[in-house]
């Protein structure tokens, strides 16, 4: 069975987790912001709908 040679230090582990959590928080904030702008109608984002895709074919 594969086993790591040495234990990863707590500080290295915490740094990695902090990086992952920060990236996840940034993406969540972007998604929330986009959702809010779509709901308020202030966005220039065009959400693709199935009807538009059928017309192109």
From Swiss-Prot:
It comes from the Bacteria. One of its GO terms (biological process) is translation. Pfam families: Ribosomal_L32p. The gene is rpmF. Keywords: Ribonucleoprotein, Ribosomal protein. GO terms for cellular component: large ribosomal subunit. InterPro entries: Ribosomal_bL32, Ribosomal_bL32_plant/cyanobact, Ribosomal_zn-bd. The keyword rRNA-binding does not apply. Residues 1-23 are annotated as: Disordered. Belongs to the bacterial ribosomal protein bL32 family. The lineage of its organism: Bacteria, Bacillati, Cyanobacteriota, Cyanophyceae, Nostocales. One of its GO terms (molecular function) is structural constituent of ribosome. This is Large ribosomal subunit protein bL32.
């Amino acid at each position: 069975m594969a086993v790591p040679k040495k234990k990863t230090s707590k500080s290295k582990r915490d740094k990695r987790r902090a990086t992952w959590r920060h990236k996840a928080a940034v993406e969540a904030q972007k998604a929330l912001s986009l959702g809010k702008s779509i709901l308020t109608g202030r966005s220039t984002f065009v959400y693709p709908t199935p009807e538009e895709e059928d017309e192109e074919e």
